[in-house]
């Protein structure tokens, strides 16, 4: 039996898995003494319970207990024993009514005031506070359990999400694997189809044993003709050839001369309904009629068709996987349009093979309507066995397999191969003139521009109006660079350098020459960028001067803008000195090779040009790469011209300008070998590049138009400094070459006396006239090329629009003309 006066405390419990279990109730015994218990019994003597809420039930045992309590109160005065009894009875009633487990809220007990000692009141208050604290602890525990349950739910949801994500990733990986497997299966199927096609095309001539007893009887059909033929126990039969074969026009980069051997071995046979008799006399083997090239399904069993001729007529209904019709070896069968639906489709393809690729579906349907039946005559079998005599006759009098489409392609490739060097030389000659024009500009008009800019620079501090422009500052920079490089090259002794190089071994000289060529190309690629940046820095210098006068730029920033162009000027000067030194060493090395006794070094240097073929021919090139190679060939050609000119004049000066026939012949042979090797190597290189990459020779004319468009720029009205923009495209820097020419030729001109001054004036006038003449030629070529290109583009656009509109109307005419041409060829 449980005591009703015992309180219970709820304590949360947990397991090892951190799972919360239901609350456990632990009994709490209140510490109440006997005096306190007696006082409590006296308190509730005249109690009257007033319910505050009608909804809450009040546990009252019976009315007799109340009456008994009243009687006990009346007899209370008589004796103390009666008081103790009444106190015991009232305490029992209090115990019965004071049930802590029952919920009695919203009630009020009205009693009379009784004097109670303070310690008892304090103890009662403490008990109440303990009870309230216990209730608060219980509420906190309940809240904690709710929070823990929420956390557990969140963790469970996270785990479920992670599992779902893992499942999705696994599914994605499985899908990728399936896709890879499908791709592999497709590749394997394509390989099998290619092998089957090759087996069907390259099937050798196999002997066929014909047995008279095992041949099937021909089925009765409409319009059949039986022609008995002599049976041979052993004969040879040629395998049929595909009638409709697509010509692959894909671009191939392989240098093999015959990449499509299948098209050369087996030639497609054009057969029509109107020329059935001609095909009989011309082609001894039966043609293989094909529905379409896409539906060809050849299997390894197709090689054994010769052994399965007995079942061909019985399996004629299975036309979905079969693409050919096997003829009867004894009887010629005339097939009509009412015989089977497959004959109409086959006749359609047989008639469509003779037409061109531009025929439409409407023309094919018209051909099927007109050619309702084809009379296929039986093949005349060879009555004689194979012999050595027939083999020799075929070798001596046999013909060659030919294919018109492939023959035209090969012929066009040969024409392009021969035509490429001519187009290349036109482009290189134009670029040579452009480089020569910019080279002569440094000797003719740049000194005048430099002199005028220098005078304006001297006058500018004294006048506010005469300020230097960007072009004038750039001219001053270029003149300073040229003069500095000339002074630098004068400190180099050419004779000492010549004998030092001549004393080296041949192999060492060969290595030195190759290193100098590589350095030259690197310097050319870097030099043009330096001069472009120098121009823009001079522009910033002029803009900083204007802003400084207006007070828009602070002093520190203005100082950096002023010092920037001068640092660029130092870098450009160092570059020109280094590049000119490389070219000067290259000229002396070439001079040593020309003047050598056995010409071994010259042959090595010429063979070095042929090494370029290995690095450029057998590679894949785009149009941009081809244009870059063409521009580098232009620069190399012009540098070779300047080098040979310097060597000729240097050798003439060593002979005291005594021009003899031996010297002239020797120099002409050397110049011819060096120049001819350059031309030959460039022609071979570009011819094979265009052949392997399927480029047309008209590509060089497009490059010509590109260069001419930059020269004939509408923004430049007088065409002044137009070659400078072309030099950026070509990659030609004229300053190092000009510095070498001045370094070599200044000692040939006498510097003292009137004769020297008069000679210099004459040379200057000749150079000016030569530059003007070259400029006129360049502008004329540019204008003519641009106008021709515009005319060709307009004609091409108009022809394309007209051809697209009339293409549908001319399809039937093309079919008729193609059939007539094929008939004429066969009759011939």
From Swiss-Prot:
A cellular-component GO term for this protein: endoplasmic reticulum membrane
Protein's membrane topology: Multi-pass membrane protein
InterPro entries: Tatp1 (IPR008010)
Entry annotated with the keyword Ligase: no
Annotated localization: Membrane
Stretches that traverse the bilayer: 428-448, 472-492, 562-582, 722-742, 754-774
Positions of the UniProt region annotated as Disordered: 67-92, 212-236, 297-346, 797-828
UniProt keyword terms in alphabetical order: Membrane, Transmembrane, Transmembrane helix
Primary location recorded for the protein, binned into one broad class: membrane
UniProt KW Cell inner membrane keyword: no
Pfam families in the cross-refs: DUF747
Biased composition annotated in UniProt, kind: Low complexity: 67-83, 212-233, 302-321, 797-822
Domain of life (superkingdom): Eukaryota
Family: Belongs to the TAPT1 family.
Protein name per UniProt: Protein TAPT1 homolog
Organism: Dictyostelium discoideum
Lineage: Eukaryota, Amoebozoa, Evosea, Eumycetozoa, Dictyostelia
